[in-house]
Curated annotation (Swiss-Prot):
Signal peptide limits: none
Domain of life: Eukaryota
Protein name per its UniProtKB record: Protein dalmatian
Chain intervals with Acidic residues compositional bias: 797-806
GO biological process, one term: trachea development
Organism, scientific name: Drosophila melanogaster
Biased composition (Basic and acidic residues): 771-781, 807-816
Compartment list: Nucleus; Chromosome
Keywords: Cell cycle, Cell division, Chromosome, Mitosis, Nucleus, Phosphoprotein
């Protein structure tokens, strides 16, 4: 605040006895004349002058313009001229002007740190020494935006002074100028720089708002430091970055040319160490010291913030741009700590808040919470293998790589053959599943799962589990099986309940890594692992994708090893599904599947297949006779009476063919299908069963001989090349090469005449094959030939047409000739259309003839 000299020519007692003026617009009085101002009744406040002092006191009421600065008063051009001292005195002493009894004496005093100097305190009571604060509605009031963000609210103390008049009161406010000066100590005080040229704008009033904001948001601060300037300079110096400059000629940015400093080789080392010196001084000693005090512990992949990291979750803490502020360390007074976004005052306030709310033992509390979380969810780096018991160690491991000892340190991906550590003992040979590429499938590349918690004591849990298999798998399997890259997922039947569970099976469930071969193929809870062949539980032959193949045969191929309890394994839904897919062939299955005690095999049946009858799936074996009769097969003999001769075979065939829902006409065509699917199984015993099924069908001599050559090439032959089986889709499944059908080589000599007819039949197809390119989108090559054909239709003169051919390219300019060429081929198109119509009708007739089987008697 500026101390001003009181004007000696004004006697103070005269002012107090001033008369009250009538309400109205008062005359303007000069400020230099007297420091005492009259406050009239409320009216429209005048605009504040530019040099006005903002920290002046006022009495309650709406003031007239109090120009605080005595040196510079800038007036608008329309205002009246300044009154002299005499004029102002006469104006005051005139009897017309009634002055209110409220008199304000303004005295400017420098206040240091909010303490009024001794001189001002000892002054006469009528002289008020408090700082001036304008009212909210006055023109001298600073806008509310600025008031909120920069200055804390002024705390007013109403001190009752000596009552000179009933309305006189002194308002002493605790000035905020002391702490406000501390916010930016570098800059000169903003409000009272009288010696500088007065260019005062609205933005300069609100400028200290930005002390709390980051440096990047200060727009009008020219000398602020770029936080990343040193990094950019170092990058440019190292040659990793280049400064872009806008070129004067073109205006496009170009790289600024920097002169390369050629240093001698000896000095090069010294310069690099100088550049790197300031870095360790900043960061290293502070970060290392708290870590040295802690006991060393095993690392885990859970990220635990150390003490020297800033805790982002703490209340009111925001991480600065450049230097991470260490919350629990006392803030250093050096300049390095304050290079971030916050001013000194803001940083100290926030650090005091966080330290009050988070005392030092909060780190121990955080460590406790982290340990509690680690017990619940853990992702250990070195996953400990559960101890391998002797029983499971003897069983064959599925992976060809030998398991390491449980105490050995294992890498994250040690199980896969493609991620083998150098120390792990490898076998001499790798057994890969034979798919077509002779490479291991994706399921063999077993990636070890992260985020799986292995309990510390798996043996204790295993003792408590009763010897009973639950329907749902254990928790850790249930959660993560869907994520595993495991090809056995689609082959799983519905879960089974079987109480015959060995101790070995339970251990293999408890220990996630001890995978063993299990004798039961229908076991649901086993995991899919590399190099394991898939047990195909059920293969459904899909109906043919061709329209003319009407009869679809669907058979169930069963595994050899049968579950110990047959009824439990096959659910009723499965049985009904396989039952409905069997159309008319279920009687064969019913007769063949029921085990016979004393029957001698017929000629066609192999003796080995008879012994295997007991192993057939219970889904078919448990069918009773009433279930068979639902399909209308009442005439079928009981299954013990299976004939030993061919004649009764034919009788049974005819009786079953009556129940084929009208498909019995095509039974000769679909007879071949079971022989086609025999070669697709992995199991030797299944082959024998299917061969035995084929032998139950009638022989070639018993049926009228049908020529299969033409039909097979068109209708049925493509089913050999097409892979219509779901087993071709599965990975790591061994696919046997398809066997040739039996009936191809045994063709009778009577079919030679058919072959002759077929040669004759192929001729028209070959003769008209030249027309095929016309149907494509390719431009036709023989254009000249078409012109020759046109010449025959339009005979004018041969010489003209020959000239036309030669000059066709030259005469394209004339539009008349163009039109002529376009019109000419129309008759030729009609001719071709008739030809094509004849060809298609002839081909249709040939196809219809082919459909009828030629029976040679």
């Amino acid at each position: 605040m500026v101390r001003t000299r009181p004007v000696p020519c004004v006697p103070s007692p005269d002012v107090n006895t001033a008369t009250r003026r009538n309400p109205g617009r008062p005359k303007k009085q000069s400020i230099g004349a007297d420091l005492s101002t009259t406050i009239s009744k409320p009216g429209r406040p005048k605009k504040l002058s530019i040099g006005a002092d903002l920290t002046t006191i006022r009495k309650p009421g709406r003031p007239k313009k109090l120009g605080a600065d005595l040196t510079t008063i800038i007036r608008k051009p329309g205002r009246p001229t300044k009154l002299s001292n005499k004029q102002s005195l006469t104006a005051l002493n005139e009897p017309e002007c009634r002055i209110r009894k409220c008199v304000v004496k303004i005295r400017r005093i420098k206040v240091k740190n909010g303490v009024v100097s001794e001189i001002s305190r000892n002054d006469a009571p009528d002289v008020d020494a408090s700082t001036f604060e304008p009212a909210r509605n006055s023109t001298m009031y600073i806008p509310s935006k600025v008031q909120k963000s920069t200055q804390p609210q002024n705390i007013k103390e109403n001190v009752a002074g000596p009552e000179t008049s009933p309305c006189q009161q002194r308002i002493r406010s605790k000035s905020p100028s002391g702490p406000a000066a501390e916010i930016s100590p570098k800059k000169p005080p903003r409000f009272f720089h009288r010696d500088q040229p007065l260019t005062r704008t609205r933005s300069s009033v609100t400028r200290n708002v930005f002390d709390f904001l980051s440096q990047s948001q200060i727009e009008d601060d020219s000398d602020r430091e770029d936080p990343a300037a040193d990094i950019i300079q170092r990058l440019v110096k190292d040659g990793k970055a280049c400064v872009m400059v806008r070129s004067r000629k073109i205006g496009k940015p170009r790289a600024k040319r920097t002169a390369k400093k050629v240093r001698p080789v000896g000095n090069r080392r010294k310069v690099s160490t100088k550049d790197n010196e300031p870095e360790p001084v900043k960061v290293v000693p502070k970060s290392i010291e708290p870590r040295l005090q802690k006991p060393s512990r095993s690392l885990s992949t859970i990220f635990e913030p150390e003490e020297d990291y800033s805790n982002d979750s703490e209340h009111g803490y925001v991480q600065p741009i450049e230097v991470p502020v260490q919350v629990h360390v006392e803030p250093s007074t050096s300049k390095q700590a304050h290079e971030g976004a916050y001013s000194n005052l803001a940083r100290s306030v926030m650090l005091n808040q966080t330290q009050a709310q988070n005392p030092l033992p909060s780190t121990d509390r955080r460590r406790e919470l982290i340990n509690m979380a680690r017990q619940l969810v853990s992702t250990p780096l070195n996953r400990r293998a559960p101890p391998v018991t002797d029983v499971s160690a003897t069983t064959t491991a599925l992976s060809p790589i030998a398991h390491q000892s449980p105490n050995a340190v294992r890498t994250a991906g040690g199980k896969s053959p493609w991620r083998v550590s150098d120390d792990s003992p490898l076998p001499n040979t790798f057994m890969f599943g034979f798919n077509n590429s002779q490479m291991p499938s994706y399921s063999s590349d077993h990636v070890q799962r992260r985020h799986v918690y292995v309990p510390d004591s798996p043996v204790e849990h295993a003792e408590n589990i009763p010897h009973e298999e639950s329907i749902c798998p254990p928790l850790h399997e249930q959660n993560h099986d869907s994520n595993a890259n495991d090809s056995n997922e689609e082959n799983r039947p519905p879960p089974t309940i079987s109480k015959s569970m060995s101790i070995n099976d339970q251990e293999s469930e408890e220990n996630a890594e001890n995978f063993v071969h299990l004798p039961n193929p229908r076991r649901t809870l086993q995991k899919r692992t590399p190099f394991k062949d898939i047990n195909i539980l059920e293969v459904v032959t899909l109906p043919s994708w061709k329209k003319n193949v009407t009869a679809t045969v669907s058979k169930e191929i069963t595994p050899t090893r049968v579950a110990p309890r047959p009824m439990a394994t096959s659910s009723p839904a499965q049985r009904s599904q396989t039952r409905s897919n069997l159309f008319g062939f279920d009687d064969d299955f019913a007769c063949e599947d029921i085990p016979r005690k004393s029957t001698t095999p017929s000629k066609g049946i192999a003796p080995t297949s008879m012994s295997l009858n007991r192993e057939v799936t219970p889904a078919l074996a448990n069918r009773n006779q009433t279930e068979v009769n639902t399909f209308g097969c009442n005439e079928i003999l009981p299954c013990e009476n299976i004939p030993k001769e061919k004649e009764t075979n034919t009788e049974e065939r005819t009786s079953s063919s009556q129940n084929l829902f009208g498909f019995d006409e095509f039974i000769t065509e679909s007879q071949d299908s079971p022989a086609n699917f025999t070669g697709l199984s992995q199991n030797v015993n299944l082959h024998d069963k299917l061969h035995r099924l084929a032998e139950l069908r009638p022989r070639d001599g018993e049926l009228p001989q049908v020529s299969y050559t033409s039909i097979r090439s068109d209708c049925l032959g493509e089913s050999h090349s097409k892979q219509t089986d779901i087993r071709y889709m599965l990975c790591s499944t061994m696919i046997a090469p398809p066997r040739p059908a039996k009936r191809k080589p045994a063709a009778p000599t009577a079919r030679e005449s058919m072959g002759l007819f077929r040669v004759d039949q192929d001729e028209p197809e070959q003769s008209f094959a030249d027309k095929q390119p016309r149907r494509t989108y390719v431009k036709e090559r023989p254009q000249r030939k078409r012109k020759k054909r046109v010449q025959i239709l339009y005979i004018e003169s041969e010489s003209e047409d020959e000239d036309e051919q030669d000059s066709h390219d030259k005469s394209l300019d004339s539009p008349e000739k163009k039109r002529h060429h376009v019109k000419r081929p129309r008759r030729d198109i009609e001719h071709e259309a008739k030809l094509e119509q004849f060809v298609t009708s002839f081909n249709k007739q040939c196809e219809e003839v082919e459909k009828f089987p030629v029976i040679i008697e």
